[in-house]
């Protein structure tokens, strides 16, 4: 009985082996057929190429292409169609289509018949080409953006500091510190000068400049990388509004995560008026880690992400939509237009995200000098600010912020344009809208 079972098993194994062999043979046959079909198709395409090549010089000019389609397919191509077909297929830009260029285009047609080749080539020639900004060396873009950001932040440092002091003024972080809340812009700046001298206008700015260079670089590169990923994968020439919002938000969060400790240190140095608790970036970092742990360097990170992501998203999207609405296709905006669009987009983004920015600052600076912790997280801060200060409390320091955003954007764009000229960067290659 066992011998019979063994024989049956052997027979089954043999059958399985035979089936596997048959499958392998079938796969080999398919591969061979594909190779044969490809070879036959290429041979047929070469015949068509030779028929079109009337002067037998191994390449086709626009006249040969037009006459060939008319003679062999009875298709009367317009001159502009032939021009587009030539431009798309002519990879070496010699105004002629050589055999390898013809094969590259025609091999993707549904069949080697001339009618199908013509239809495919026409569709291929009108298919959008996505020009990635990678043509410009990354270091040029990073340098231009970094210098522009540093100069603009330095020029608007007094208003930036005034904004932060208004945001956190009620927290009484230092005894005898002057009150800025409720004062006018001019009076507040006078108080700052009287109390701290000219240097008071720029407290925390060194940290801000050090932070803004990598922040701008990472944000710019992240935006371009995410944008090009969507464009290349979806075969698009520009992003939709929703895609721009997503890409801008992702770029904002990426840059924030990489530079957040510097932003927090900058806030601590900025709100310091009389005291010398913190002496520079390194000392501030050491003291925060010693008193609050490493986690102290990331206080308010969640609130910051909630504010930065929509801010950058709205900023980029508003700017792109303004360009799309008012700038003719295939042209770049003038300096004045760029300044105007940038100011509008920055003001729009700031208005919509300012409450989150205010909460972020308060979370970053609470606990300084052993002061009480007022807020237990983002949502607790939001609730208590409305309860204690009203809805308008979410907008403390808004006017100085507006006055800072517009010149900051303007200066940034102006310096950026100068840097592009110095570094000979072609504006068309780095347009956000490819």
UniProtKB/Swiss-Prot annotation:
Belongs to the mitochondrial carrier (TC 2.A.29) family. The chain crosses the membrane at residues 142-159, 204-224, 245-265, 294-314, 339-359, 403-423. Ca(2+) 1 binds at residues 53, 55, 57, 59, 64. Residues 160-203, 266-293, 360-402 are mitochondrial matrix. The keyword Transmembrane helix applies. Residues 1-37 are annotated as: Disordered. Ca(2+) 2 binds at residues 90, 92, 94, 96, 101. It is a multi-pass membrane protein. Keywords: Calcium, Membrane, Metal-binding, Mitochondrion, Mitochondrion inner membrane, Repeat, Transmembrane, Transmembrane helix, Transport. GO terms for biological process: adenine nucleotide transport. CDD domains: EFh. It is found in: Mitochondrion inner membrane. It comes from the Eukaryota. The keyword Magnesium does not apply. Residues 1-141, 225-244, 315-338, 424-434 are mitochondrial intermembrane. The lineage of its organism: Eukaryota, Amoebozoa, Evosea, Eumycetozoa, Dictyostelia. Residues 1-35 have a biased composition (Low complexity). It comes from Dictyostelium discoideum. Solcar repeats lie at residues 136-229, 239-325, 333-422. One of its GO terms (cellular component) is mitochondrion. This is Mitochondrial substrate carrier family protein B. GO terms for molecular function: calcium ion binding; nucleotide transmembrane transporter activity. Calcium-dependent mitochondrial solute carrier. Mitochondrial solute carriers shuttle metabolites, nucleotides, and cofactors through the mitochondrial inner membrane. Residues 40-75, 77-112 form the EF-hand domain.
């Amino acid at each position: 009985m066992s011998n019979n079972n063994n024989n049956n098993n052997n027979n089954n194994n043999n059958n399985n082996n035979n089936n596997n062999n048959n499958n392998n043979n079938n796969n080999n046959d398919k591969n061979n057929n594909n190779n044969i079909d490809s070879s036959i198709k290429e041979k047929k395409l070469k015949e068509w190429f030779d028929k079109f090549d009337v002067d037998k010089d191994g390449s086709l000019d626009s006249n040969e292409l037009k006459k060939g389609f008319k003679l062999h397919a009875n298709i009367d191509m317009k001159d502009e169609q032939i021009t587009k077909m030539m431009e798309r297929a002519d990879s070496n830009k010699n105004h002629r289509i050589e055999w390898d260029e013809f094969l590259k285009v025609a091999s993707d047609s549904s069949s080697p018949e001339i009618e199908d080749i013509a239809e495919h080539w026409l569709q291929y020639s009108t298919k959008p080409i996505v020009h990635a900004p990678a043509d410009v060396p990354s270091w040029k873009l990073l340098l231009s953006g970094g210098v522009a950001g540093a100069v603009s932040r330095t020029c608007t440092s007094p208003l930036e500091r005034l904004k932060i002091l208004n945001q956190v003024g009620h927290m009484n972080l230092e005894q005898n510190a002057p009150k800025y809340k409720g004062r006018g812009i001019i009076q507040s700046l006078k108080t700052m000068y009287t109390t701290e001298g000219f240097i008071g206008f720029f407290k925390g700015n060194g940290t801000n400049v050090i932070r803004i260079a990598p922040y701008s670089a990472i944000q710019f590169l992240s935006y371009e990388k995410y944008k090009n990923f969507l464009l290349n994968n979806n075969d698009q020439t520009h992003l939709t509004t929703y895609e721009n919002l997503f890409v801008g938000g992702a770029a904002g969060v990426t840059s924030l995560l990489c530079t957040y400790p510097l932003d927090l240190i900058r806030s601590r140095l900025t709100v310091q008026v009389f005291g010398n608790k913190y002496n520079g970036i390194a000392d501030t970092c050491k003291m925060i880690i010693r008193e609050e742990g490493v986690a102290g360097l990331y206080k308010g990170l969640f609130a910051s992400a909630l504010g930065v992501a929509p801010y950058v998203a709205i900023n980029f999207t508003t700017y792109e939509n303004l360009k799309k609405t008012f700038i003719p296709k295939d042209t770049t905006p003038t300096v004045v237009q760029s300044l105007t669009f940038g100011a509008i987009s920055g003001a729009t983004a700031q208005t919509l995200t300012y409450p989150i920015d205010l909460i972020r600052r308060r979370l970053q600076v609470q606990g300084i000098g052993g002061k009480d912790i007022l807020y237990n997280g983002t949502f607790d801060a939001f609730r208590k600010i409305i309860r204690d200060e009203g809805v308008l409390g979410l907008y403390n320091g808004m006017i100085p912020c507006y006055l800072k955003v517009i010149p900051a954007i303007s200066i940034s764009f102006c310096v950026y344009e100068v840097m592009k000229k110095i570094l000979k960067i072609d504006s068309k290659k780095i347009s956000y809208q490819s």
